[in-house]
Amino acid sequence: MKPLVEKGIISVEVETMYRNPEISGNGYKTVVSLNPAQTAVAEDFKNRYDQGIRETSLLYGVTGSGKTEVYMEMIRHVLAKGRQVIVLIPEIALTYQTVLRFYRQFGRQVSVINSRMSAGERYDQFERAEKGDVTVMIGPRSALFTPFPKLGLIVIDEEHESAYKSELSPRYHARETAEELARMNGASVVLGSATPSLEAYTRAKTGQYRLYRLAERAKK
């Protein structure tokens, strides 16, 4: 074939086809309305981010307080700055409905990885992230290794979950790894939980982390 190409008899076009776990849904860009408590948290985060403050924050909110909606507002702000975002969710909670909520907000900017994907599928998603084809990667602790060139935020939902600890070699804790990764990339970290780990809560109470509270359930 190469001689035919060199003689101009035929032409070859190369198109990359990714093994993409397609997310289907009824469109996206649904409107998310924040209540005053959620708004206060999101606005404080955005103001500090705009000031160049990169830190770890603990979003301590009761079940049903709307932490996910706050994450989305934070993510939207970081994406508007041309940065990229990793969202860690425990594998057991990484359901279709959970991912769909993000997809409806950010559309095809969102990709997902999980343990059920083949090595090739995971490779494709990492390559898309590196090229900038996706800007929000959702997954379990392994999503931390997404090669985003402009990482701006790491969200760890249900940060108290033991699933964030890897007991196999290489051993690591997703929270500690995320903080180091954020430091290297000039990014922020947001930890979320209704029952935060003792380590995270202690660091928040002693000023090592910024502490946000959502004390009441969000009204539907």
Predicted regions and their residues:
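Accessory, non-ATPase domains that flank or precede helicase/AAA+ motor cores in DNA-metabolism machines
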Residues: 1-195, 200, 205-219
